[in-house]
């Protein structure tokens, strides 16, 4: 036993110093915490009296002991509750095992309680004062009190089932047959009825009915005509018209497409300024002046109408199909747009002067400007003047041939000779390009003289 201190000795600490530190510091600290320094268990009151702990430290020791006893009792109660619950669902073999564990836990709990009773008696008055000051009085909570009016679950379920089986008020609406057979064409009404569908609420039945007769949809013939007019293509054939009078889909009482109330003046031949204006797609109400009309067309209906398709695209009929195509072709041959005019003006501003082609005897800059896009591009390509540099190019070829012949004959192997050779070539080309740059103003002065 004497060598146990040397087993934990540090290089600069002897076993005697470690033993003294244990006896003077660590042992007293464990005793103040209520732990036996030998067995590392909670100490009893007799041991505390035997070790004569300071009276000022006794409240700390007692609180530690009471907390430990509370945790032990709570643990024992939890184990007992778990064993009781498991005994209801486990087989007989598990019952025997849990009963043994329960007995062992009860014995250990009784031993702990007996050991801690003596240590907690001398501080009972102090503990009572602490509990009264720190723990508020919440009153008595009655958790096991039965409710005053118990709920009859069976009666509640029966009432719920009967409410589900009761007939529900049906929501009346348009049927499939009505949606197919009672759809009138666009010629029988105006577009305002299509935009603002009327609803008639029935207060007695608490349901809303939407009359299908108020829904206005365009006829197939008008849809095909509008698609044909919107494509602006001569290669497309006109779509076949559908005779609504002989069709089985629409009823006999629905008006045909020939009774259209829309009349378009001049097949919607509008100018570019008013084609997309707000007034081109809106009709004035009936209360306005009768002289007001849309630039694109008018309606003879008594209701207000907003027909975007009819005002944006013209209706192309079979009898005047050729006339409408001629009208569309005439619309394309208009004045050039703003950007085309700007491009022509830019090309005219960038035209070369007469001295570029003075040797050829042609003065392209005096050509009248073209106002078409294709002609402006062609004129821009044709007006590119090429300076007459044939003598200078021949001079460059001759000088380069002389340089190459001199380089091969002299066999310039030294760095100095190569340096002088390239420096001479650099200054020669610098002089050539500077002369080529300044020769244009010189030729301009000669032409002015």
Curated annotation (Swiss-Prot):
One of its GO terms (cellular component) is nucleus. It comes from Physcomitrium patens. This is Myb-related protein Pp1. Its main location: nucleus. It is found in: Nucleus. InterPro entries: Homeodomain-like_sf, Myb_dom, Myb_TF_plants, SANT/Myb. Residues 5-26 bind DNA. PANTHER family: F14D16.11-RELATED (PTHR47994:SF5). One of its GO terms (molecular function) is DNA binding. Residues 1-30 form the HTH myb-type domain. Pfam families: Myb_DNA-binding (PF00249).
């Amino acid at each position: 036993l004497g060598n146990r201190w040397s087993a934990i000795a540090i290089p600069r600490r002897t076993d005697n110093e470690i033993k003294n530190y244990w006896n003077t510091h660590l042992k007293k600290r464990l005793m103040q915490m209520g732990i036996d320094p030998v067995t590392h268990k909670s100490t009893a009151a007799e041991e505390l009296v035997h070790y004569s702990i300071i009276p000022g430290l006794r409240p700390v020791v007692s609180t530690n002991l009471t907390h430990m006893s509370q945790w032990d009792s709570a643990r024992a109660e939890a184990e007992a509750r778990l064993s009781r619950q498991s005994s209801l669902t486990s087989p007989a073999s598990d019952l025997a095992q849990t009963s043994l564990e329960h007995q062992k836990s009860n014995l250990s709990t009784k031993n702990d309680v007996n050991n801690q009773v003596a240590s907690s008696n001398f501080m009972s008055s102090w503990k009572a004062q602490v509990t009264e000051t720190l723990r508020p009085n919440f009153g008595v909570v009655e958790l096991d009190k039965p409710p005053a009016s118990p709920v009859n679950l069976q009666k509640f379920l029966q009432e719920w089932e009967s409410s589900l089986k009761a007939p529900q008020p049906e929501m009346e609406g348009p049927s499939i047959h009505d949606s197919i057979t009672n759809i009138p064409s666009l010629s029988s009404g105006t577009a305002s009825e299509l935009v603002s569908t009327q609803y008639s609420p029935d207060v007695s039945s608490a349901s809303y009915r939407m009359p299908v007769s108020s829904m206005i949809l365009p006829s197939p013939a008008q849809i095909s005509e509008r698609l044909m007019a919107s494509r602006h293509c001569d290669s497309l054939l006109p779509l076949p018209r559908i005779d609504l009078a002989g069709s089985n889909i629409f009823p006999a009482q629905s008006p045909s497409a020939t009774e259209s109330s829309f009349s378009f003046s001049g097949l919607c031949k509008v100018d570019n300024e008013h084609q997309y204006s707000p007034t081109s797609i809106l009709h004035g109400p009936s209360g306005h002046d009768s002289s007001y009309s849309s630039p694109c067309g008018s309606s003879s209906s008594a209701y207000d109408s907003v027909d975007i398709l009819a005002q944006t695209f013209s209706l192309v009929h079979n009898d005047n199909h050729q006339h409408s195509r001629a009208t569309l072709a005439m619309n394309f041959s208009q004045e050039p747009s703003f950007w085309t005019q700007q491009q022509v003006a830019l090309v005219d501003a960038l035209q070369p002067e007469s001295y570029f082609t003075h040797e050829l005897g042609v003065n392209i800059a005096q050509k009248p400007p073209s106002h078409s896009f294709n002609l402006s591009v062609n004129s821009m390509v044709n007006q590119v003047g090429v300076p007459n540099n044939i003598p200078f190019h021949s001079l460059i070829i001759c000088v380069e041939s002389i340089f190459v012949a001199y380089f091969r004959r002299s066999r310039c192997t030294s760095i100095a000779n190569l340096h002088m050779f390239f420096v001479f070539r650099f200054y020669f080309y610098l002089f050539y390009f500077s002369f080529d740059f300044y020769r244009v103003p010189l030729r301009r002065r000669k032409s002015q003289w």
